[in-house]
Amino acid sequence: MAAADEPKPKKLKVEAPQALSENVLFGMGNPLLDISAVVDKDFLDKYSLKPNDQILAEDKHKELFDELVKKFKVEYHAGGSTQNSMKVAQWLIQEPHKAATFFGCIGIDKFGEILKRKAADAHVDAHYYEQNEQPTGTCAACITGGNRSLVANLAAANCYKKEKHLDLERNWVLVEKARVYYIAGFFLTVSPESVLKVARYAAENNRVFTLNLSAPFISQFFKEALMDVMPYVDILFGNETEAATFAREQGFETKDIKEIAKKAQALPKVNSKRQRTVIFTQGRDDTIVAAENDVTAFPVLDQNQEEIIDTNGAGDAFVGGFLSQLVSDKPLTECIRAGHYAASVIIRRTGCTFPEKPDFH
């Protein structure tokens, strides 16, 4: 008799998926206002920018932001890698509102107000640490063809303080409510102690902590902070360029992305109840996934190259899509499918923006 009864719970699960609670997904990072424009090669050369890169602004980039606004047709979008991912995840989750939480630091200014408004519009539960020493951070997205060169002027984003925000009980309770955590590697340049506090909490409570390699410079110049948090990472994201730099910095002695994924998966881990999963996207090429004992290649959705408007935010969107299914304990293949879907939507639009409702089934 029991055998006949077995499928019932499964069926029930499909008809009535467990309702998600608010704040089930937690993200923390650098909230930035993206200033994006299609530029020319001369502009990239003038500021010695690579066509497809992410860097932090230096003194030589001081004029870049003004020149971008004066010389090209710019668009303003609420950005910042982790914040983008939270918005995309919330968009795919739809209900409840505020399933995704976001922490970061902004200035008390016009750009800060825009970020607050945009987060509210996206139904993300954003709790910003607001300070008046630095203005809200900006990120110049210099687009040429299918490439985007990002120059981030962190400003206020760099002022996030663990003891002034994360440690406050009213904020920490939101961390405790989450089941899945996501922090872009970028935030390791700002507050590694905040990243570690959240990572440790996740490991101690057997919840899922996820991290992104974010940019080649993180693996190069913030290696210590990155490797301090790596033992807590249950799911590691990155793209092919970041994977290659990470492998070189770690002495993996291979350029094969599947091998790199395997070696990253095998790095020491604190919570032995969860084996690490490593996911490397490669633009239009297959997404490489090291999970359990296999490395699998997942093809991305066929995309008409003419339809691609702006690849900025594609990686963030992939993560957001992935996390939107992970919070409901969907299988890995579904998480990847949602990631690919989200990225395919975002690259057809400027900035990390999306239509009102998703079309993902």
Swiss-Prot record:
Tissue expression from the record: Widely expressed. Highly expressed in liver, testis, kidney and spleen (at protein level). In brain, expression in most forebrain structures and the cerebellum is higher than in the midbrain and brainstem (at protein level).
GO biological process: AMP salvage; dAMP salvage; dATP biosynthetic process; GMP salvage; purine ribonucleoside salvage
Gene Ontology, cellular component aspect: cytosol; nucleoplasm; nucleus; plasma membrane
InterPro entries in the cross-refs: Adenokinase (IPR001805), Carboh/pur_kinase_PfkB_CS (IPR002173), PfkB_dom (IPR011611), Ribokinase-like (IPR029056)
GO MF assignments: adenosine kinase activity; ATP binding; deoxyadenosine kinase activity; metal ion binding
Motif Nuclear localization signal, chain ranges: 7-15
Reaction(s) the record says it catalyses: adenosine + ATP = AMP + ADP + H(+)
Pathway(s) where this gene product acts: Purine metabolism; AMP biosynthesis via salvage pathway; AMP from adenosine: step 1/1
Active site (catalytic residues): 316, 316 (proton acceptor)
Cofactor binding note of this UniProt entry: Binds 3 Mg(2+) ions per subunit.
Activity regulation information from UniProt: Activity is inhibited by 5-iodotubercidin and 5'-amino-5'-deoxyadenosine.
Positions bound to adenosine: 34, 305
Positions annotated to bind Mg(2+) 1: 48
Alphabetical UniProt keywords: ATP-binding, Cytoplasm, Kinase, Magnesium, Metal-binding, Nucleotide-binding, Nucleus, Phosphoprotein, Purine salvage, Transferase
SUPFAM superfamilies given in the database record: Ribokinase-like (SSF53613)
Cofactor: Mg(2+)
Binding site for Mg(2+) 2: 147
The enzyme's E.C. designation: 2.7.1.20
UniProt xrefs under PROSITE patterns: PFKB_KINASES_2
Residue positions where Phosphotyrosine is found in the record: 76
Subunit composition and interactions: Monomer.
Free-text function comment from the UniProt entry: Catalyzes the phosphorylation of the purine nucleoside adenosine at the 5' position in an ATP-dependent manner. Serves as a potential regulator of concentrations of extracellular adenosine and intracellular adenine nucleotides.
UniProt record similarity statement: Belongs to the carbohydrate kinase PfkB family.
Name of this protein: Adenosine kinase
Organism of origin: Mus musculus
Gene that this polypeptide is encoded by: Adk
